[in-house]
Design a protein with these regions (language model features):
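Sec-dependent N-terminal signal peptides
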Residues: 7-15
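Solvent-exposed loop/turn segments at secondary-structure junctions
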Residues: 157, 179-182, 494
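Hydrophobic h-region of N-terminal signal peptides that target proteins for export
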Residues: 16-22
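Eukaryotic helix-linker segments that join adjacent hydrophobic helices
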Residues: 86-156, 160-177
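Extended, low-charge, aliphatic-rich alpha-helical segments
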Residues: 4-7, 22-127, 185-497
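Short, low-complexity, polar/charged sequence segments that are solvent-exposed and flexible
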Residues: 139-140, 148-150, 169, 178-180, ...
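A short, charged helix-loop
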Residues: 173-189
Length: 497
């Protein structure tokens, strides 16, 4: 039996089984996974910045979760249509049908290359009770009635799901058919009654097949849909930034996994110009050992920085109000450290004043993934003294080239970063008090440690959001850094749906 189901669109870049996924890990290093069988990815679009792979293990786990949902729905199934059939002068009526006992369904998935997924459900045994009544009219009338208990020794449901990309970057899923195999044994107590029952048995099988298919496909169309609709294609964060997770290509299926390919780009909200550069190709993923893999391009970070840079969000003023201990004072407190002690000439010429530091970028900060995560920050440090008499004195200007090595952390559906070490170079661009060869390293090092690094880490602590579902615990997790590619591999356990 095949039931044709309508096509429905889903406004998200993830397949329905991804509703069982939530990333929650705090590890930053792990051993690389090695496999002997290479699994090529399909990446035809140069805009891909984010790839998700759900493996056969992940689909099997999700298929069993769906089977558990079916089990709960069958427990509360309280209506099966009555059956009335008339054949060869015999009218058979079956009423008050009810499922009185059944074994928990077992679910697993079968990936169909270049097509989609088949959700297979197996119910080992089911018992259905009801009342029967038959009447035959010829040159005499004979009728009888009674109760019965029918046994389904094994029931198999095969639900085929076709998956493609919608016009707006979400997913379109079509439940193309539900095939069911039912082995029904119906015993009314005597050979004569069983002959009569055999007339109704095919019709009863059809009713049960239809009911089971309706419930199972409803899990996809209603339960999965309600969760998927909460997973957006675009996420606005920090009020002004938008992460675009729209799907760029149809999902790619092999027997071992499904991959989806996404934009993975951060832009300024309502900015029509977009990002003027594209992501570099991601390293082909060969692993299939975990249930889920996420590949994140360094383009995600670079587009985020460009959006901030192009809207002047990376320029800022630093005064004593921003730093501890009055470090920018030209006259130090007793026993304290300040710029007047680091550079005595400033303290002598401008006593009891406070320096204002302007920090701005020449270029957008640049992230590079290549075995490690590195951030390159090029900017200008401009030191001024706003005198109490109202005059503003420009002291010196330093060009800064900062290279910072970062750690990456994925926790609570966000990708976080933090500087773990850094190096920098300076160029003396403007200096009214000191010679060209003056060493500004101690001062620059102080400013970087006390303000620039904390400022960058503050942004890293905000994190970049990932489209995931809460309520899941991940296990057996690894985070791997390769050229332009950050790869997260994990298994997961669902505590509740």
């Amino acid at each position: 039996m095949s039931n044709k189901i309508q096509v429905f669109a889903i406004p998200t870049g993830l397949l329905f089984l991804s509703l069982f996924i939530f990333v929650k890990t705090q590890t930053t290093t792990a051993e690389d996974i090695v496999t002997n069988k290479e699994q090529p990815s399909v990446q035809n679009n140069s805009d891909i910045g984010f790839i998700m792979r759900i493996t056969a293990q992940g689909f099997d786990y999700g298929a069993q979760l769906g089977a558990d949902v079916l089990y709960q729905k069958l427990k509360h199934m309280n209506y099966i249509p009555d059956l009335i059939t008339k054949q060869n002068g015999v009218e058979m009526t079956i009423t008050n049908l009810s499922i009185v006992d059944f074994s928990p369904p077992v679910g697993y998935a079968e990936l169909i290359p270049d097509h989609g997924v088949r959700w297979i459900l197996s119910i080992n045994h089911t018992k259905v009770s009801g009342y029967w009544n038959y009447i035959t009219r010829a040159w005499f009338t004979f009728q009888d009635e009674g109760s019965f208990l029918a046994v389904l020794h094994e029931t198999i449901l095969n639900i085929t799901i076709e998956i493609t990309r919608s016009s707006y970057g979400g997913v379109v899923m079509t439940v193309s058919e539900c095939e069911s195999i039912i082995n029904l044994e119906m015993n009314l107590g005597s050979w004569l009654y069983n002959i009569v029952a055999s007339l109704a048995q095919p019709f009863l099988e059809n009713i049960l097949q239809s009911q089971l298919c309706d419930i199972a496909t409803g899990i996809i169309k209603v339960d999965a849909m309600s969760i998927l609709e909460k997973l957006p294609v675009n996420i606005t964060f920090q009020n002004n930034y938008v992460m675009d997770y729209s799907m760029l290509e149809p999902p790619y299926f092999t027997e071992d996994y499904m991959e989806t390919y996404h934009k993975g780009e951060v832009t300024w909200k309502d900015d029509k110009e977009g990002i003027p550069f594209k992501p570099m190709p991601l390293i082909p993923l060969i692993e299939t050992d975990r249930m889920l893999y996420l590949q994140i391009s360094d383009h995600v970070f670079n587009s985020y920085c460009y959006a901030a840079f192009s809207h002047n969000m990376l320029s800022f003023e630093v005064t004593n109000d921003n730093l501890p201990g009055n470090i920018l004072s030209t006259t130090c407190e007793s026993g304290g450290l300040c710029i007047g002690r680091l550079l005595p000439k400033i303290g002598e010429q401008f006593p009891n004043e406070s320096i204002s530091l302007s920090v701005f970028n020449n270029l957008s900060p640049h992230w590079t993934f290549d075995d490690t995560i590195q951030l390159n920050f090029k900017g200008i440090l401009n030191f001024n003294i706003p005198l109490k008499n109202g005059r503003n004195v420009s002291i010196f200007m330093i060009e800064l080239d900062l290279k910072a090595h970062m750690s990456a952390v994925i926790k609570d559906s966000r990708l976080y970063s933090q500087i773990v070490k850094f190096t920098f170079k300076t160029i003396n661009r403007k200096n009214s008090l000191y010679g060209e060869n003056f060493n500004f390293y101690p001062l620059t090092n102080l400013v970087i440690k006390k303000y620039v690094i904390p400022r960058i880490n503050d942004q890293g602590r905000i994190g970049i959001p990932l489209v995931m579902m809460s309520g899941t615990m991940v296990v057996n997790t690894e985070l791997k850094i390769q050229k332009h590619t950050l790869t997260l591999g994990t298994d997961f356990e669902i505590k509740h749906l």
